[in-house]
């Protein structure tokens, strides 16, 4: 009898050890790259803006930490007169593609954007309006890192804070090196999630065929913030606007947990959050959601040669909502800017700047509805002033 009990106890202990070992191995896979594999990991964002009643807006950013270093290549007008000021439904921002390998790998990448336009990229690539190709670059584990810098405080740089291998294009003297492949663009098709504000309820709807793994509703006003999480969205759901009494740090941990759960390594998730923290959690009301992989592959089909043994693509959708409160404050500021007073104009700029890049559609509508030409000119000048960096105003 005692032998049977002892045997059962031994088996139970061995099973517990085995489960713990498997759990730790699975956890470790999300913390750092696996050895002996050629892998590619990508993260990026899709940003859209809609009115409170859910109408998608054509928009261009007025302000915000989206400026890129001077060495980044751009379209030189192929997507309009300055991609930053070109109106679009969706802005595809900071996709970065990392590679992992134990030995040198010569590779090529092609990304298509059928319903959009590629606007910026680095390193040097063959870029046309709807496609971008990096041909014959080398993933070089252990190579001396000699990445370009321009002395700016661009949010581009935190994306380098990962264990990805350096990538080199061209020869050592005239070539370029970076920790990732970077590209950005503007799109003209709607995203799979719509948002609508009704009283204190946010109505979210998944129009796509696949489940959206996680949705985060975030709101911030006057320095106070709150958030709510909705899991596994299919069809339509309603989320109450949060009380603005929650600290940000728990949300940052939830964000990192979400990104790692989708396949990013911990350092990649941390780099993404560091890149976007200032912009993601500014004043306003917005919905974040994990783009279904099928939607990402449809919007941005990608080809990598040689084919990696692992390809992870994690895109965060950001749906900005123009609330009635936000619209009222911006319109009041627009009227204030029409007064012939430097003090009034400074107040208008400070009011609108709180809403970062997303005041554009409200100001554009105010300009269209202005009663006289002088008001239209004043609002247009306000928009131009807001488009400048803060230190040049």
Residue spans for each PLM region:
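Bacterial N-terminal signal peptides that target proteins for export
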Residues: 2-12
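Bacterial N-terminal signal peptides
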Residues: 10-21
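Sec/Tat signal peptide C-region and signal peptidase I cleavage site
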Residues: 24-28
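Protease-labile, long low-complexity intrinsically disordered regions enriched in Pro/Ser/Thr
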Residues: 29-393
């Amino acid at each position: 009898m005692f032998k049977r009990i002892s045997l059962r106890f031994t088996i139970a202990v061995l099973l517990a050890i085995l489960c713990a070992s498997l759990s730790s191995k699975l956890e470790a896979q999300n913390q750092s790259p696996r050895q002996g594999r050629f892998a590619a990991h990508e993260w990026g964002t899709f940003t859209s803006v809609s009115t409170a009643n859910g109408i998608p807006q054509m928009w261009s950013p007025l302000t915000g930490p989206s400026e890129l270093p001077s060495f980044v290549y751009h379209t030189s007008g192929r997507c309009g007169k300055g991609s930053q000021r070109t109106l679009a439904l969706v802005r595809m921002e900071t996709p970065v593609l990392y590679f992992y390998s134990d030995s040198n790998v010569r590779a090529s990448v092609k990304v298509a954007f059928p319903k959009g336009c590629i606007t910026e990229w680095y390193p040097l690539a063959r870029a046309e309006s709807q496609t971008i190709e990096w041909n014959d670059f080398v993933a070089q584990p252990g190579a001396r890192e000699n990445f370009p810098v321009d002395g700016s405080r661009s949010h581009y740089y935190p994306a380098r804070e990962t264990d990805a291998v350096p990538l080199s294009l061209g020869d050592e003297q005239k070539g370029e090196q970076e920790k990732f492949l970077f590209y950005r663009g503007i799109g003209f098709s709607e995203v799979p999630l719509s948002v609508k504000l009704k009283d204190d309820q946010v109505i979210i709807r998944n129009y796509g065929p696949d489940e959206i793994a996680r949705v985060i509703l975030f709101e911030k006003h006057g320095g106070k913030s709150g958030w709510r999480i909705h899991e596994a969205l299919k069809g339509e759901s309603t989320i109450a606007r949060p009380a603005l009494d929650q600290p940000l740090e728990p949300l940052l941990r939830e964000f990192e947990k979400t990104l790692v759960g989708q396949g990013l390594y911990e350092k990649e998730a941390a780099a993404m959050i560091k890149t976007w923290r200032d912009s993601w959690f500014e004043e306003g009301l917005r919905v974040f959601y994990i783009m279904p992989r099928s939607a990402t592959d449809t919007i941005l089909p990608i080809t990598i040669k040689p084919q990696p043994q692992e390809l992870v693509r994690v895109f965060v959708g950001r749906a900005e909502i123009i609330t009635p409160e936000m619209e009222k404050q911006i319109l009041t500021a627009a009227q204030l800017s029409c007064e012939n007073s430097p003090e009034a104009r400074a107040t208008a700029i400070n009011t609108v700047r709180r809403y970062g890049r997303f005041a554009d559609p409200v100001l554009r509508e105010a300009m269209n509805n202005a009663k006289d030409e002088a008001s239209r000119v004043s609002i247009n000048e306000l928009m131009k002033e807001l488009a400048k960096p803060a230190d040049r105003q």
